[in-house]
Each structure stands twice: as structure tokens, then as C-alpha cells.
């Protein structure tokens, strides 16, 4: 931005335009424990110094505007302004910088992810002085964390509700995602749960379409759940998608699910919005429902390396807004996910305290204090041959979700579920015996398939299936 002269006005302040860095770039600032800290990847326009670009981000996402205004004198800018307190170059990128910005806690409404994002990313991403801007990470202070309920129940309470311990949970997204009648949909749910899965799932775009209205789907799925439970002696669930066009309709669907006695509902938290999601999460805690979260639309926001918002920020926001599960990539399947970076935000979802670790993309130490954890869901292009790697990468506190990897079994849905359950139990047993899943995984699956014809058939069908593309989500 080219410097412009200030003019003296008769109202007693210096009107005009001045460089942002004069007010908002403060390299000597010592951050407070109560500050919200942000790490932005900044790509300035040619000729714009990094300090000016970083200061512009701090200004436009807090108290600043493009010109000096006389009402600045009616408040304490020094108390309320955002500050760009550090800038560092991005390795291997000549035109990109990481700008660290500190925001005073008083800028944000308590318990509102909506307000937090409106302030930090709501306006500044269209700023002309920047070619591109990406929010890489946020540090949420303990004082702000304590204003959020967070997940309705969390990992331990969910395990207690399900009475399932010592292994990942198994799920399946019902396919085809669109076009089935409610009765046929419920039949697929029953067959998968009866075969050994813990959960089945509505696809994210299954809401209430002409071919299958939500109430009919809920009824047939509830029947399938209770029938499978009575026959297996295990607690089962189906993620009934309550996402709707209005909050009132969403809540009506959640209330009906509770009245049916099912254990879990679902929400598309990005397309549905954070206000709706937080509302639903509060209802779920008050009424004993687990809440599964799908991240539909996330790649629109997080896929580009130099612009948008990294998924670790969306994951933190979800933990604050509320959800017991969230999709988090697979590392090994068809959807995006580089191993170290994926495990970085998986830890941010599950653990109470996470140390700064730039090798995994974690820019700040994060203390969640007593906020419950979220189960990461691995889903997308995975099958029985991936089971050893998934078990080793994600550990017990996860949901492994096989859609086509269940329903695509040559013998049908129930045998597909059996194959996945046998593969999982074999991997967990081998791990508990001290075997190396990364090195011996294929052998473990082959040995298990000798006494499970369902697993043997699945192994044969998917033995050549690979999704080998370079990951976009790299440091």
C-alpha cells in the first residue's frame, strides 16, 4: 500500500489514510494467556511489505478500517485492537509469510463460534492488498474454552453408552446415497448392523427428498436398529441426519429421533452452520443423544494451500461448537489426508493438551481443559486391506467407516459387514499380541481370511484397488 499524507481536520484529529503497520504491527508485544492467537499464511500483492500485509490482517479482522475515523477517540484502541506480533517466511515460498496475530478476548462473544469466525475470517479474506490468505491455526485460550459446552458427551461417555471398549468402532455409509426408498434403506441398515457393524450412516446429502422423506427413513431405520440389537446382543446405531433448511425443522427431526429411542443423530456442520450446530449439540447433551458430524463442504474452504482455512481450524471449531464424531480423512483411502498433518488435527480432536509441533502443522500449544474429546471418523475409499493401517494409524478411539467397502461385497451387505468385523478383530488381536501391523498387516488379514469365507471374498475383490495420488495437504 502506498503511503498517503495525513490531513489536519478542524474536528481535532488527523484525518486521512495511514499505513496499518504504524498501529497494528507490534513486534515487541508479549502475548497474554487470554489472547486468541492466529497464524495466517499471507501472500501480499507485489510491492506490499510483509509487515504492512500482516498489520492489515490484524486491523481488518479487529478494530481497523481503511481510514482514520474520529470515533477512535471514544474508545481504547490499545485495549481492543488485534496485533501482528511476529512474521516469519514460509520455507520454499519466496512470496509467502506466516503472520501471527493476537486478539484480545473481549472482542469475542462467549460461547459463539459464529462470532469468532465472523471477526477473524469474516471480512479480511477479500482484502485487495493480499493476493491470498489462509488461516493455518488458532490458539483458543482456556478462558474462552470454558464458555463452550463442547461435544454433547465425548469419547468416554460414548463408550459407556455403547458398552464397547478396546477397539475402533465400525461404521458404514448406506449406498447408493440417493434414490433408495425408506424401506429398502432400512433393510440395508439392518443387514449391515446384523453383520457386525456398530453404526450405519445417512450420507451427508440425505435429508428429506421426494424419494425418501425423513420421517419414513427414521422409522424404518429405528426398526432396523432394534431388530439388529435384539439378535446380536450389541448396542447399535444409525446416524440419522437431522440437517434441514431451518433450525426449527432440524430440531423437529432431532426430537423425533429421541422419541424413537435411537442413540445418535447427525448434522452437516459447515453447510448447516455453526449456530445450528451448537443449538443441536446442546439439545443432544440435554437429551442423551450422541451427535455425529459430517464436514460436507470442507474442501471448498481448506483444499487450497495458500488460501482459505486449514481443516485443523475447522476441527477446533467443531470441538467448541459440539460433536461426538467428525470425519477426518483416512490417510490411506480416496479422500485427502497426509499422515502427520492428519494425526496432528486428530490429536487436537481427542486429547486434552496438545504441544506445539510444527512438523505436524500445530502452530500453538492447545489446552482444552475439561472440554470432551471427539472421535475422528476415517471414511472414503477404504476396504479390508486397509484395516491394519487404519487400526495402527488411528488407534482405538476412532470410527472406521466402510461404505462401498461393506456394500460392495460380492455376497451382499451382511457378508460385507462380517468381513470388516473379522478383519478388525484380527488386527486388534494381533496388535494386542505385540505384532507390527504396519509390517505384518497383509499377513494378518490373509490368515484371518482362512477361517472367514466372507473376508476371503472381500480380499479377492479389492486386492488391486489403490488410490495413489499426491496429497495436497502438505506443510
Swiss-Prot record:
Which positions bind substrate?
123, 173, 177, 295, 327, 379
Instruction: Indicate whether Nucleus appears among the record's keywords.
Output: no
Q: Which residues carry this modification: N6-carboxylysine?
A: 201
Its main subcellular localisation, reduced to a broad class, is plastid
One Pfam entry for this protein is RuBisCO_large
Give the UniProt entry's GO cellular component terms: chloroplast
**What Gene Ontology terms describe what this protein does at the molecular function level?**
magnesium ion binding; monooxygenase activity; ribulose-bisphosphate carboxylase activity
NCBIfam families named in the record = PRK04208.1
Family, similarity comment: Belongs to the RuBisCO large chain family. Type I subfamily.
Function, in words: RuBisCO catalyzes two reactions: the carboxylation of D-ribulose 1,5-bisphosphate, the primary event in carbon dioxide fixation, as well as the oxidative fragmentation of the pentose substrate in the photorespiration process. Both reactions occur simultaneously and in competition at the same active site.
The molecule here is called Ribulose bisphosphate carboxylase large chain
Species this protein is from: Actinidia chinensis (Kiwi)
Amino acid at each position: 500500500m502506498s503511503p498517503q499524507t495525513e490531513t489536519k481536520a478542524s474536528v481535532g484529529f488527523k484525518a486521512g489514510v495511514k499505513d496499518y503497520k504504524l498501529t497494528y504491527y507490534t513486534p515487541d508485544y508479549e502475548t497474554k494467556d487470554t489472547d486468541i492467537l492466529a497464524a495466517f499464511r499471507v501472500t501480499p500483492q507485489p510491492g506490499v511489505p510483509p509487515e504492512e500485509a500482516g498489520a492489515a490482517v490484524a486491523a481488518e479482522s479487529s478494530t481497523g478500517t481503511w481510514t482514520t475515523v474520529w470515533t477512535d477517540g471514544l474508545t481504547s484502541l490499545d485495549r481492543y485492537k488485534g496485533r501482528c506480533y511476529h512474521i516469519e517466511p514460509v520455507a520454499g515460498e519466496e512470496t509467502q509469510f506466516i503472520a501471527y496475530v493476537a486478539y484480545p478476548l473481549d472482542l469475542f462473544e462467549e460461547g459463539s463460534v459464529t462470532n469468532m469466525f465472523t471477526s477473524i475470517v469474516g471480512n479480511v479474506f477479500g482484502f485487495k492488498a493480499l493476493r491470498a490468505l489462509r488461516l493455518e491455526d488458532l490458539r483458543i485460550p482456556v478462558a474462552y474454552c470454558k464458555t463452550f459446552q463442547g461435544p454433547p458427551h465425548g469419547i468416554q461417555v460414548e463408550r459407556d453408552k455403547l458398552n464397547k471398549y478396546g477397539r475402533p468402532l465400525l461404521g458404514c455409509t448406506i449406498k447408493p446415497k440417493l434414490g433408495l426408498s425408506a424401506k429398502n434403506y432400512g433393510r440395508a441398515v439392518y443387514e449391515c448392523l446384523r453383520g457386525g457393524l456398530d453404526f450405519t450412516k445417512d450420507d451427508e446429502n440425505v435429508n428429506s427428498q421426494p424419494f425418501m422423506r425423513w420421517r419414513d427413513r427414521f422409522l424404518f431405520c429405528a426398526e432396523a436398529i432394534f431388530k439388529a440389537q435384539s439378535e446380536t446382543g450389541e448396542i447399535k446405531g444409525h446416524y440419522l441426519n437431522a440437517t434441514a433448511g431451518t433450525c426449527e425443522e432440524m430440531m423437529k427431526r432431532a426430537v423425533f429421533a429421541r422419541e424413537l429411542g435411537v442413540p445418535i443423530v447427525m448434522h452437516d456442520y459447515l453447510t448447516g452452520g455453526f449456530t445450528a450446530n451448537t443449538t443441536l449439540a446442546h439439545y443432544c447433551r440435554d437429551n442423551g443423544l450422541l451427535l455425529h458430524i459430517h464436514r460436507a463442504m470442507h474442501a471448498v474452504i481448506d483444499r487450497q494451500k495458500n488460501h482459505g482455512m486449514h481443516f485443523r481450524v475447522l476441527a477446533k471449531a467443531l470441538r467448541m461448537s459440539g460433536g461426538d464424531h467428525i470425519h477426518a480423512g483416512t490417510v490411506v483411502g480416496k479422500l485427502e489426508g497426509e499422515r502427520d498433518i492428519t494425526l496432528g488435527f486428530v490429536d487436537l480432536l481427542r486429547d486434552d493438551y496438545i504441544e506445539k509441533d510444527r512438523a505436524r502443522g500445530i502452530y500453538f500449544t492447545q489446552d482444552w481443559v475439561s472440554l470432551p474429546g471427539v472421535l475422528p471418523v476415517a471414511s472414503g475409499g477404504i476396504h479390508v486391506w486397509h484395516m491394519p493401517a487404519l487400526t495402527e494409524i488411528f488407534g482405538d478411539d476412532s470410527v472406521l467407516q466402510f461404505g462401498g467397502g461393506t456394500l460392495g461385497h460380492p455376497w451382499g451387505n451382511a457378508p460385507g459387514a462380517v468381513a470388516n468385523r473379522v478383519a478388525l478383530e484380527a488386527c486388534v488381536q494381533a496388535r494386542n499380541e505385540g505384532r507390527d501391523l504396519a509390517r505384518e498387516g497383509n499377513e494378518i488379514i490373509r490368515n484371518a481370511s482362512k477361517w472367514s469365507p466372507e473376508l476371503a471374498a472381500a480380499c479377492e475383490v479389492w486386492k488391486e484397488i489403490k488410490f495413489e495420488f499426491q496429497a495436497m495437504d502438505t506443510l
